[in-house]
Amino acid sequence: MKNKILVFDIGGSFIKFSLYFQDKFMTKGKVATPLDSLENLLIVLKQIHNQFIDECEGVAVSMPGIVDSVTGHMVHGGSLRYINDINMIEVFKKAFHLPVAIENDGKCAALGEVWRGSLQGIADGVVLVVGTGMGGGIIFQGKLLKGHHLSAGEFSFIRTNNEHADNVDYLLGMQGSSSVLAKTVAKAKGLPEDAITGERVFKLIEEGDHTVQKIFQEYCRNIATQIINLQTILDPQKFVIGGGISANPLLVATIKEELEKLYLHSILNFVRADIEQSKLGNEANLLGAIYNYMQSHHLEV
């Protein structure tokens, strides 16, 4: 692609950004995401844009929430609670005075895997992004499945228990959350909630901490159970596991182990899910946002 595109991956904690040109990320950076107001979010984005104002020819955005990527209308902004019922393409066009394309972050991850990652050449696939919640995207017959209400792939809202309907702890977004995993380990070790990181969880597992190993196995079993359900409903060729915690191969390896246990103890002959670790890591959303921009503006892919 000959155009220089500024790409933002706006998350609940950080905004990752890069200038993309000729199939390369020319520069990368990240800053904290303002969580108090849209005005402050735009101030931060404009400050980043000003660094590239003489080079940038368009803006690609990956962000949380329910978004119509064609019209730009956002029903809500997910973890960005100040975004509700607003056209974010128009907001960004006014801020940057450039062509803009936006898409949901989980769907961007799926598009990134289709374009440059583990779903290249795959007609039907599912991307699970393990992070603060459980995001992702669904590729059906080679195209991104958005759903009638633009909510396809919002895996965080899957219920894992038919009791306690008023308790969000039983949603997959909590059961599969890497931050909840860390807090659970901290509680089990008698430590403050914020005393354990994802990296520390893996370190404790490697050191042979049986308590943490058991917690991690249960965590992976919960994800494996939902993979079986999604395999039954969608029948994809492949699942790709992404998100920050997936950088450690132990996550996918343990999910596979727990899947095998579930298959072995079942009297039914399930179609076995094919699972792979994301090859793109933290670049999946950025690449997916670029891919969405090129498709939206009819540029050569």
Each language-model region and where it sits:
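A short acidic/small-residue loop/turn micro-motif
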Residues: T33-L35, Y82-I83, S151-E154
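Active-site glycine-centered loops adjacent to acidic/histidine catalytic or metal-binding residues
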Residues: D105, G131, A289
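Short beta-strand segments
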Residues: D9, A60-P64, V127-G133
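General beta-strand structural signal in soluble alpha/beta enzymes
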Residues: V100-G106
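Glycine-rich phosphate-binding loop of actin/hexokinase-like ATP-binding domains
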Residues: Q120-Q175
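ATP-binding/phosphotransfer module of carbohydrate and carboxylate kinases, centering on a glycine-rich
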Residues: M1-G58, S69-T71, F92-H97, W115-G117, ...
